[in-house]
Amino acid sequence: MAGIGFELKKLFRRKGLFASLRAYGYAGIICTGPMLLGVALQMGILLLCGWVGAERAQQDLLVCMITYTLLFSLTVTSFFSMPVTRYLADMLYEEREQAILPSFWGSSSLMLVLGCSLYGLFLLVSGATLLQGLLCLWLFAEMIVNWNGMSYLPAIKDYRGILCSFLAAIGLAFGLGLVLVVLLGFPVPEGMLFAVAMGYGLMMVWDVVLLYRYFPQSDESPWPFLKWVDEFLPLAFTGLCTNIGLFAHLVICWVGPVGVQVKGLFYGAPYYDVPALIAFLTILITSINFVVSVEVNFYPKYRDYYSLFNDGGVVGDIVTAEEEMLAVLNRELRFTALKQLFVTAAVLSLEGTLLDLLPLGFNDLMHGYFRTLCVGYGLYAVGNTILMILLYFTDYRGAVTAAAVFAVSASGFTALSMAFNTAFYGFGFLIGAALFYLVTLLRLDAFTANLPYRVLGQQPIVAETRAGRFTRLGLFLETKSAARAKHAAGEEREDE
């Protein structure tokens, strides 16, 4: 990702307002991808439904179905995304580009089988109609591929193509939704679900075409990436726990006093969900800043420091390089925190005026949730930036510990807040995010206090290869694929 930041930095150096807007647009899509699309579509759908006068029950059902699909797909992909990203980085470093496309389809197919099976079972008993269930499952499958694709797309550095796919998806979803619901009179849930699925589908096809233009096709096995899941299992749990901490408070509020049963097993908390969605957008600045500023300025010092260990640098040079690297890191993290603080303060100052202009029905309780969650998401954003730095230093144990603290504390304190007045519900996530920030900060400070020992003394003397369940699953799938290919080749020879 530091390489992506260097490329984006070139765009930021160009003068002019439009050049800066384009650079921030590219960075935003690279950093947030389908999640930003999901939030934008959610807000757009609410505005469109309000404009056409749709019933509140239909709006709530539509929002619930899209939100459930988003969160379920995020949960499935969050476990595999970091190991897959590590596999991609290793293949690029080893110049084995021919292994990348097979791993994309292998990881996508594995997540599709797992996710569609579980989500399909939920939809069967959820109370959704057959058409609604099929549309949700279709949208879920597209989101799985899109989420997985965002691990691969930054490597191609075709920012214009990625941005065009994003804008085309939004345009198609809104345009088709307008035609189906307003002009043709389709029911709101089914019509808008179909429109959103078509938008995500266009983005999926567009992004896959971009990948095929850049990476070579090959007949290599699609399953070696599973060895990386075993090898870097803490990365998998780091992604999963971070996802749980980020979204568990929404699910808990759905079944709490502010939650409502929309239909069957579809629950929602409109007074809480809408402020949470808008507050989530405030972390965009920190996400972009991490790629185009923190990594870009930190990475050269980081590379120089570790190259001294690899190339036989003297002790004096290593000490000097370490001091320079940590000074840059501290400066960039401080600037990141200040930028997020400024954005959060500005949003809190203006939210009363701006949100009342939108036809979202904000009341005093929703304004309170929004302010609380803005602070919580701001703390999460800075904590997540520090977490990424821990991963830079390969402190996987510290990263997974911090992520687990975030998941447990955000979920636990949110559940505990259900016993208090509804005005305090957002504070559970706020406390969890604050603990996440503190744990990551303290861990980074402790880890970098004795960095040479971490680099040299904690490395294993003998290299070990972990062959766990995922490795065995990969070998099993490779055996089955080889047997199937051999059988197909035998049938072809018989036909000849």
Q: Which sequence ranges carry the predicted segments?
A:
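Hydrophobic faces of transmembrane alpha-helices in multi-pass small-molecule transporters and flippases
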Residues: 20-36, 163, 221-248, 333-342, ...
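Alpha-helical transmembrane segments of multi-pass membrane proteins
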Residues: 67-72, 109-112, 121-153, 343-349, ...
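Hydrophobic alpha-helical transmembrane segments
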Residues: 165-212, 423-445
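Transmembrane helical elements of multi-pass membrane transporters/channels
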Residues: 195-199, 203-295
